[in-house]
Swiss-Prot record:
It is an enzyme of class 1 (oxidoreductase). Residues 1-32 form a transit peptide. Siroheme binds at C518. Its main location: plastid. It comes from the Eukaryota. One of its GO terms (molecular function) is metal ion binding. Binds 1 siroheme per subunit. Its EC number is 1.7.7.1. Residues 13-36 are annotated as: Disordered. This is Ferredoxin--nitrite reductase, chloroplastic. The gene is NIR. [4Fe-4S] cluster binds at C473, C479, C514, C518. Changing I221V: Probable allelic variation. Residues 13-22 have a biased composition (Low complexity).
Amino acid sequence: MASLPVNKIIPSSTTLLSSSNNNRRRNNSSIRCQKAVSPAAETAAVSPSVDAARLEPRVEERDGFWVLKEEFRSGINPAEKVKIEKDPMKLFIEDGISDLATLSMEEVDKSKHNKDDIDVRLKWLGLFHRRKHHYGRFMMRLKLPNGVTTSEQTRYLASVIKKYGKDGCADVTTRQNWQIRGVVLPDVPEIIKGLESVGLTSLQSGMDNVRNPVGNPLAGIDPHEIVDTRPFTNLISQFVTANSRGNLSITNLPRKWNPCVIGSHDLYEHPHINDLAYMPATKNGKFGFNLLVGGFFSIKRCEEAIPLDAWVSAEDVVPVCKAMLEAFRDLGFRGNRQKCRMMWLIDELGMEAFRGEVEKRMPEQVLERASSEELVQKDWERREYLGVHPQKQQGLSFVGLHIPVGRLQADEMEELARIADVYGSGELRLTVEQNIIIPNVENSKIDSLLNEPLLKERYSPEPPILMKGLVACTGSQFCGQAIIETKARALKVTEEVQRLVSVTRPVRMHWTGCPNSCGQVQVADIGFMGCMTRDENGKPCEGADVFVGGRIGSDSHLGDIYKKAVPCKDLVPVVAEILINQFGAVPREREEAE
């Protein structure tokens, strides 16, 4: 199947074929993960009558910044109050970060205003103060559309964390992104300049902003891709940050907002857990996308994305993104933070009314109905990308490397950059499973690449089968919201389970330190969500709620609770039991006896 070429962003037609003309609506039923919620999401296509007053925008533009109107400020959450006191983007637009960086942490803590700058507003610049566990240190999150980065960028990030010694490291995130750790405030202005010099930005990557646009990690090199997602994710990112200058029209959202563009039958991009997912589809011979909306995880509620009953052409990818963000900005809840994601707004308005609000914000105030000609083959078997695989370009291959729970040190990043230069084209690609792909490797160089010490000793293209699908959030080592330590524990538990049972196929296991579910446990075959519990002696200890049954792909499904509040020290036999009973694992002792 031919794909849309990278240099042809907006095709007038396409020869791509749909796998069938089935009804393309997903099942609107949703799996709740903590508390029961309104059934509105299940009947979203049936809109209640909406009072005209409810559709009055709650924000207005003042001096270039979008602010909440006075009449809508009753009952707002603390984050909204911080935004009203001073727009966080002023730290960037008016270079407030330079003045802030001259203050000691002691000086910062003397003023509520400065503390709010450090602990809240800096998140608009991608800086997260780790006050609880690493006082005075920051995590910095970037924008990396489609997960594509370069050896030069990787070296620069390595140079930043290297100076921080044991406090410095980097993580690959579940949105194909980099997070670097150990940053101190006085260094921030120079780091921001350094990012700009290598074509990177951290702008608008935290809090109530559009998060990193996810795309196919094999975009442009996959022999079976539907469309090259890189042009679209790049356009979305450029719009969101106004080419790294700051797009003030969408920096005061009610809550974060996650987009993705689907380019493969494999659905590597996980469309069902995004606020907006672009699903490839043709209509009247023209290439475009059907839209799914509202997928999200939170402490209170988890929902799969549902159809908007809308199709846009390739040239309307950014306009519909803009229209939806403006509708969310104008009408979304700003009270309880657990009820501020976009799906709550869809619930209240009903899908048709929400769709109408998006439509009237389109350039021509027209939003076409969904196409029946979806291009994703629903019976497609998801392919493995770890290891060596041929590209669509003759004589070239890509090599997928396993990065254990996504954690890297400076010297390892430098080595990866060197390897990308020596064996590939200087490009690296990050995946939502926290791994890295080296594309454009000449086939004649494959053997030499596989013999590199880094691949032999650390980042294997052929990891143990249970390690392949292992994902873990930051955990309590660095994150103040995490209840338990995750990364080291995920590796340790998996290693111990591997000694007990033998499995014949990968099993995706995800760890998250708290109910915010940054580790996306609900999409895993087996998921672990951190909690506090009690051991056999009644003493408090770290534990995990165990989820089972998450599915990805066209038959997506959010997992269900299997067992609550299991002490972490007791997880190994529980996991082994699940693997034997539900995934065909065999106890090692029986395997050896046979």
